[in-house]
């Protein structure tokens, strides 16, 4: 079942005294978090009643049945998932969800296996891939651009790396 779920956000803290929570959102449009229906965390489902965007990837949400700060406190650090079939269908083969990239192979242009995508970050200026390099057993971070990663194959689960000279 875990493969069928996509993480949409994480509850970071309670907000106020009436049970609202702050949620860090991992979707392109944070205000749409309530449109996916029930969100799953562990064995529980949550319905988002209302959402107010307070930052680029941060919202204040009210959750059905959570009516006090104490109840909201129990939700701190809970990841919120949605079933993959609830996501919007992608129109183009060059479109994909970031969650699809995690654990994908990184191959060099000669098809040699270089490493695996460990995580994806965005610090404000674009997506950064954290790559676990097989040969050095270390992690590196590279900007996720078309120049550095010219080809993404979702079906076969690999990305081609055009190795920047400074990495060698």
Curated annotation (Swiss-Prot):
Belongs to the RimM family. InterPro entries: PRC_barrel-like_sf (IPR011033), PRC_RimM (IPR056792), RimM (IPR011961), RimM_N (IPR002676), RimM_N_sf (IPR036976), Transl_B-barrel_sf (IPR009000). Residues 93-167 form the PRC barrel domain. Its main location: cytoplasm. The keyword Cytoplasm applies. Keywords: Chaperone, Cytoplasm, Ribosome biogenesis, rRNA processing. Binds ribosomal protein uS19. It is found in: Cytoplasm. This is Ribosome maturation factor RimM. Signal peptide: none annotated. The PRC barrel domain binds ribosomal protein uS19. GO terms for cellular component: cytoplasm; ribosome. An accessory protein needed during the final step in the assembly of 30S ribosomal subunit, possibly for assembly of the head region. Essential for efficient processing of 16S rRNA. May be needed both before and after RbfA during the maturation of 16S rRNA. It has affinity for free ribosomal 30S subunits but not for 70S ribosomes.
């Amino acid at each position: 079942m875990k493969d069928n779920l996509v993480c949409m956000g994480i509850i970071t803290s309670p907000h106020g005294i009436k049970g609202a929570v702050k949620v860090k959102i991992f979707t392109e449009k944070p205000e749409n978090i309530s449109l996916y229906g029930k969100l799953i965390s562990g064995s529980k489902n949550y319905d988002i009643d209302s959402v107010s965007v307070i930052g680029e990837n941060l919202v204040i949400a009210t959750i059905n049945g959570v009516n006090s700060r104490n109840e909201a406190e129990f939700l701190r650090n809970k990841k919120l998932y949605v079933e993959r079939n609830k996501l919007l269908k992608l129109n183009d083969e060059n479109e994909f969800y970031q969650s699809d990239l995690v654990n994908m192979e990184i191959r060099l242009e000669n098809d040699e296996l270089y490493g695996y995508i460990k995580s994806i970050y965005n610090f404000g200026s674009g997506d950064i891939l954290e790559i676990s390099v097989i040969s050095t057993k270390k992690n590196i971070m590279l900007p996720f651009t078309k120049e550095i990663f010219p080809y993404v194959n979702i079906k076969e689960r690999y990305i081609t790396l055009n190795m920047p000279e400074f990495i060698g």
